[in-house]
């Protein structure tokens, strides 16, 4: 359900701002035992972040998330992140977590 909401939010932005978003890139993190930061391409305005195999925690306030602290992305769901793409950190809750990230401008 969250995946659909993220897509609806992006579509809503399309109509609100009168333009489409350009896909700018994709990356996958398969090791999340320690917090990771994103590597957005130049011009990226937001990212769709999907948790795979495990719930994922994130923070963007300068403090690294842990397996028990931070905002949660439920496994197999995604969120739209419109904050500072270079600042957000993500970590798995349990071993085997991965994330898929799509960037848009």
Protein language model regions, located:
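Short, intrinsically disordered N-terminal pre-domain segments
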Residues: 1-22, 103-105
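Short, Lys/Arg-rich amphipathic alpha-helical interaction segments
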Residues: 88, 100-105
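Beta-sandwich interaction modules
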Residues: 70-85
